[in-house]
Amino acid sequence: MANSQVAEKEKLDAQTNNQDSVATIVTTENNKKNTIPDSEKKIVYSTQNLDLWYGENHALQNINLDILENNVTAIIGPSGCGKSTYIKALNRMVELVPSVKTAGKILYRDQNIFDAKYSKEKLRTNVGMVFQQPNPFPKSIYDNITYGPKTHGIKNKKILDEIVEKSLRGAAIWDELKDRLHTNAYGLSGGQQQRVCIARCLAIEPDVILMDEPTSALDPISTLRVEELVQELKENYSIIMVTHNMQQAARVSDKTAFFLNGYVNEYDDTDKIFSNPADKQTEDYISGRFG
C-alpha cells in the first residue's frame, strides 16, 4: 500500500474511532457463538407497515422489520429518530402516552399485538424490559426478584428461593449478592442495580428482553459486565437493544437497524452495517459525521 493510502486509512480510522475494525473482529467472534444459521431461526417479531404518531408528530414511518429469535438486535440512530419509541411499541408501552395512535401491525410470534383481544399483560410477561437508568424497587434484593413471580400467584417460599437464585445466576450476579439478599437494592452500585433489574426481568421467564440504552448510566467496568451478560443471555432469549454507543453495537449485536427520522434507513448483519453499509447516511452516522 502506498504511503498516501496508509495515511488516508489512518485518518479514516481516527475519524471513526476504529468502528470498522472493532465491528469486523468482534462480530466475527459473536457469529462463532451463533451456531444456528439465520435461515433456521424463527421470526420473533415482524413489524409490518408500522406508523406511529404522538399527536401530530409522526414518530415512526412505514417500519418493516423482522427480528430473529436468539439474536441480539441493536437499534441505532441519532436522538429523536424513533429508536426508543419503536422498542416501546414492541410491548405497547407507548400506549401510556394518551395522544399516541398507530397504524400497521406488529406480529409477536405471528400474533398481532394491536389486536383488541390481545392481552397486554400476557405480552409484558413474555417481553421483559430493562431501562436506561437502573430502577430497582425500594425493597430488598430478594423482594425485587420475587415481585413478578408473586404477582403471578407464586407464594411457595422454596419455589421463590429457587427463582431468586436462578435469576441472579442468569444475570451473573449471584456470587456477589447471595449473602446480601435481604439488604436494600438501593445500596448496590449502579452496575449491580442494573444486573438486579435484569435478574428481575428474568424471574418472569420472558421470551424477549428489550433494553433501552442499558449501560449509558454505567461505568466502563459495569458496562463490560452487562455486555458479557447480553452475549450469554442470547442463548436463551431474544434481545433487542437501543444504544447510542457504536462500539457497543459492534461488540454485542448480530443484527443492526439504523433508524433515521422515523424510518428504518438500513437493516442488516452487524458486520456488514459497520464494515460495508449499503447507504451513505448509514456510513456517515457510524463514522461520526453526524448524530
From Swiss-Prot:
Keyword Glycosyltransferase: no
Domain ABC transporter per the UniProt entry, residue ranges: 45-286
Entry's EC annotation: 7.3.2.1
GO molecular function, one term: ATP binding
Gene Ontology CC, one term: plasma membrane
Cross-referenced Pfam families: ABC_tran
Enzyme class: translocase
Membrane association type: Peripheral membrane protein
Major subcellular location class: membrane
Catalytic reaction list: phosphate(out) + ATP + H2O = ADP + 2 phosphate(in) + H(+)
Family per record: Belongs to the ABC transporter superfamily. Phosphate importer (TC 3.A.1.7) family.
Record function comment: Part of the ABC transporter complex PstSACB involved in phosphate import. Responsible for energy coupling to the transport system.
Protein name: Phosphate import ATP-binding protein PstB
Species assigned in the record: Staphylococcus epidermidis (strain ATCC 12228 / FDA PCI 1200)
